[in-house]
Amino acid sequence: MFAKAQRVHFIGIGGIGMSGIAEIVLNLGYAVSGSDLRRTSITARLESLGVVLFEGHAAANVIGSGVVVVSSAIDEENPEVREARARKIPVIQRAEMLAELMRLKYGIAVAGMHGKTTTTSMIASVLAAGELDPTVVVGGRVDALGSNARLGNSHYLVAEADESDRSFLKLSPILTVVTNLDREHMDCYRDMADVEDAFLEFMNRVPFYGANVACIDNPQLAALLPRVRRRVFTYGTSLGADFVVRMLPPAPEVRSRFEIASAQSVLGPFDLHVPGIHNVLNAAAAVAIAVQLDLKEQAIVQGLKSFRGVDRRFQLKGVVDGITIIDDYGHHPTEIRATLRAARDCGYANIHVLFQPHRYSRTRDLLDEFVTSFADASTVEMLDIYAASEAPLPGITSAALVQSIGQPGVRYAASTEEAVTAILDRAAPGDLILTLGAGNVSQLAPLLVERLQSRLPA
């Protein structure tokens, strides 16, 4: 890295990925500044740590910087980017800064269309239990860290790798995890063959002494593995996996219990406090990584048992009068199905979903998959599509999506208030209310808790 006297400036510092890198760079002893369009709880935390924050983008913000880091949402016409270019200040992507941090460490990178954040966090928890004290950069706030980043004192770095813009190809990890392949980020990739080629390049980037860990239960990923030139260790429920997941009856107060069978031994049992087979598979990836690092079995057991989840991943927001309110980030059909299956396995009497589709393009491209995503929901209130800076597309609306789904109990809500009122009117003790989506739907979870509390007798 360059001299610590120079300042690192982040444009779009309030993003979950950018903020984590900024915190690591700050903790390494560099002066850090950043700009974003508005202040948030994320930027407030960074300011409290010592980051100089600018609200809004202006050319003057980059003066005195030694390097400028940009998120994928920042284009070349941004005034800070233009000023940095004019002053010959290096402008790099977030992934390039992460790659520079990883270059100095034993890098473990987690990629895949779904489950990256949770899997990265589980690996970090297991390594911490094994006293490896890793540096961690993840795309969500981890309960145990109180943040989405942590600077460790060892040479291990565990990071979530972002495939959405191909920037994960800038990383050079020693170990990788690939959780799955799916039709996602099709604004960046031409087709599934293009997705497969990118992941193939990612997995072949590990050195000859490194390895890849991949989920064989995902058909698209399993089909790709014969083309990988570097070592691959597979995990999954399939008997052909190197690390075979075998489910066990859960103990009281535990969501899932499983063991891992390999050619050498049977490991476990392992207990998880987060529900769903998708989380068991995420944990299996953490076990496989731990085995590559020769961690003791007890450390793996403790690391997984102590894992309490990640912000917005099946996150409990409250229980009022027997009604449970949970918030989840799921917005892709695969994620929706996994989340609803996990909720159904938890034994709730009814599952009432408040869903906000994310992006017009995703709704259009995955329409056929959305149609079958809500089978495990009792009722669904469908909010308007969260644009995420996209322009509307003709015929792509939440009302049209509801019509395509054609499932009893799935209805379009013309307003947030209509959705909240409808879902509260039908919720009863023993039921679950689930706010679901990647937009601002999470803001409704506290409101639902508040409304339920207001109905309680004085």
UniProtKB/Swiss-Prot annotation:
GO molecular function: ATP binding; UDP-N-acetylmuramate-L-alanine ligase activity
Pathway info: Cell wall biogenesis; peptidoglycan biosynthesis
UniProt signal peptide: none
Keyword Ligase applies: yes
Catalysed reactions, semicolon-separated: UDP-N-acetyl-alpha-D-muramate + L-alanine + ATP = UDP-N-acetyl-alpha-D-muramoyl-L-alanine + ADP + phosphate + H(+)
EC main group: ligase
Keywords carried by this UniProt record: ATP-binding, Cell cycle, Cell division, Cell shape, Cell wall biogenesis/degradation, Cytoplasm, Ligase, Nucleotide-binding, Peptidoglycan synthesis
Gene Ontology cellular component list: cytoplasm
GO BP terms, alphabetized: cell division; cell wall organization; peptidoglycan biosynthetic process; regulation of cell shape
Compartment(s) of residence: Cytoplasm
EC number annotated for this UniProt entry: 6.3.2.8
The keyword Membrane belongs to this UniProt entry's keyword annotation: no
Positions contributing to ATP binding: G112, M113, H114, G115, K116, T117, T118
Cross-referenced Gene3D superfamilies: Mur ligase, C-terminal domain (3.90.190.20), Mur-like, catalytic domain (3.40.1190.10), NAD(P)-binding Rossmann-like Domain (3.40.50.720)
InterPro entries: Mur-like_cat_sf, Mur_ligase_C, Mur_ligase_C_dom_sf, Mur_ligase_cen, Mur_ligase_N, MurCDEF_pg_biosynth, UDP-N-AcMur_Ala_ligase_MurC
Main location: cytoplasm
NCBIfam families per the UniProt record, alphabetical: murC
Function of the molecule: Cell wall formation.
Family: Belongs to the MurCDEF family.
Name under which the protein is recorded: UDP-N-acetylmuramate--L-alanine ligase
Organism: Acidobacterium capsulatum (strain ATCC 51196 / DSM 11244 / BCRC 80197 / JCM 7670 / NBRC 15755 / NCIMB 13165 / 161)
